[in-house]
């Protein structure tokens, strides 16, 4: 069984790779190709956030009793902040403003990097420790990817 740390860190890397594809496409790809790449990236980010918020975080909170003010509270807040940036990116995408998309993407990348360090080095290892074998059932609830 893959640990929560490995599984979710791998998903972070998958999201990073999808953003790199969008950045490359923003240079000179046809609008439809750029739009499709952005939609894949945006869907992957939403899938990751939704899984954590609906499945992982509640399980961690139940196992540890940590809720308000705990690590999942902070992670949810950061997800909301990143969702707002993603909304701005979607608006730039819809308006055909490639540079605005990339500029917002730079902001998102900074937020994601800071967020992922916290999850990968603190929260996910804590999930491994507190969820134990229960992680396998949770992992099975992760939506199919791409």
Regions found by a protein language model. Give the residues of each.
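Small-residue-biased structural context
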Residues: 1-146
